[in-house]
């Protein structure tokens, strides 16, 4: 399925389109923890592609005011890829226009399991009481505690599932499914997705009156 893998052009267009739309935070599922089950050739392609795109795109991200934030696990991640991600984070650290969350070697269940493990360790060490654990406690132990809750989750390629992506952060996300493969999803398609999202009524589990006037004023798209 190499033909369905991303291209640098598609990545550039979507990031640029998000900046133009005023999106404050964009999360990209670059490589999942489940992707290690792919063939060695596919893994090499995805790792190499991510490294190449980061190296080539960092200057553009700096110019656009985009700050890179890596989200994921360290084990098994190629050292050269991790080095490139850290480099992009350092170079773009002062940018404030938009945050680009690079979800690399990431899995939603893995994130929650890692958070639970860290919390259990604090309880065992006597630094935290089990009765004091709240949703805020869990959030503080996620890979990127300051990440915004997701407003809009876009899935390309004709699949209608979220594939273990940002399970905690996307609890109340609006879903948008596109039949187009990722390489063909550009800024125009992004605009259409955001336009569809803008026409929806979000309730966050409550009645309309309960959330009237309390909708988020900043967008987070994945």
Regions found by a protein language model. Give the residues of each.
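Flexible, compositionally biased loop and terminal segments
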Residues: 4-222
């Amino acid at each position: 399925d190499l033909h369905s893998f991303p291209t640098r052009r598609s990545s550039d267009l979507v990031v640029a389109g998000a900046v133009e739309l005023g999106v404050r935070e964009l999360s990209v599922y670059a490589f999942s923890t489940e992707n290690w089950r792919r063939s060695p050739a596919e893994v090499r392609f995805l790792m190499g592609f991510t490294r190449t795109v980061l190296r080539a795109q960092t200057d553009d991200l700096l110019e656009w005011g985009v700050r890179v934030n890596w989200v994921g696990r360290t084990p098994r991640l190629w050292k050269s890829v991790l080095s490139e991600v850290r480099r992009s984070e350092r170079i773009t650290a002062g940018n404030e226009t938009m945050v680009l969350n690079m979800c690399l070697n990431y899995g939603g269940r893995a994130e929650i399991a890692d958070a639970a493990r860290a919390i259990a360790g604090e309880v065992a060490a006597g630094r935290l009481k089990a009765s004091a654990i709240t949703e805020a406690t869990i959030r503080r132990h996620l890979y990127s505690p300051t990440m915004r809750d997701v407003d809009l989750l876009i899935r390309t390629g004709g699949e209608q599932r979220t594939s273990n992506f940002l399970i905690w952060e996307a609890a109340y996300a609006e879903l948008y499914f596109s039949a187009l493969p990722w390489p063909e999803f550009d800024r125009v398609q992004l605009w259409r997705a955001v336009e569809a999202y803008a026409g929806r009524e979000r309730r966050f589990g409550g009645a309309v009156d309960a959330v009237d006037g309390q909708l988020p004023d900043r967008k987070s798209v994945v």
